[in-house]
């Protein structure tokens, strides 16, 4: 753990690993916290494997956090949102973001790979979200080594630019 001069945690080295039925769940990360807040920058390796899916994320993540939220309250809001229909969840999430009650993952630079429902994926790139947590820009190379540049409007509508490479 890292502590500031006031004795408050400011980040640290986090690691965990456990066997689960048909696989494992593990991660290790180097985290840096916002003042009196949870992590907002972390370098990480995360892996999950069970009988249905497997995946690995390696990269750098940046989270935009309000100055005054409480982690327990934020977790409770996310838990409540998961139980709502999509439209209601999206409205509550947007309202909570606007009111500074929850955080937003803004940037991921790294590699995501695995298999879900029999489909393989391996996307390495830069993934940027807007301040409301919606996709804004994705610049990545996919499983078949095909480069992608995807741009989204504020409502999340995709405007896709595909790079045509000579064969």
Give short role names for the model-derived ranges.
Residues 1-167:
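Parallel beta-helix/beta-solenoid repeats that form elongated, surface-exposed shafts/blades used
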């Amino acid at each position: 753990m890292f502590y500031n001069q006031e004795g408050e945690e400011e980040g640290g080295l986090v690691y965990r690993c456990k066997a689960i039925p048909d696989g494992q769940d593990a991660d290790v990360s180097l985290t840096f916290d916002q003042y009196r807040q949870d992590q907002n920058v972390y370098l990480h390796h995360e892996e999950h494997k069970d009988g249905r899916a497997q995946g690995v994320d390696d990269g750098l993540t940046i989270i935009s956090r309000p100055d005054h939220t409480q982690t327990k309250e934020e977790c409770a809001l996310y838990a409540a949102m998961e139980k709502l229909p999509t439209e209601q969840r999206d409205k509550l999430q947007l309202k909570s973001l606007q009111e500074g009650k929850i955080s937003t993952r803004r940037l991921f630079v790294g590699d995501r790979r695995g298999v879900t429902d029999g489909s393989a994926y391996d996307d390495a790139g830069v993934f940027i979200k807007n301040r409301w947590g919606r996709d804004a820009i994705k610049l990545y190379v996919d499983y078949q080594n095909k480069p992608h540049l995807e741009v989204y409007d504020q409502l999340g509508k995709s405007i896709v630019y595909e790079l045509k490479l000579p064969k």
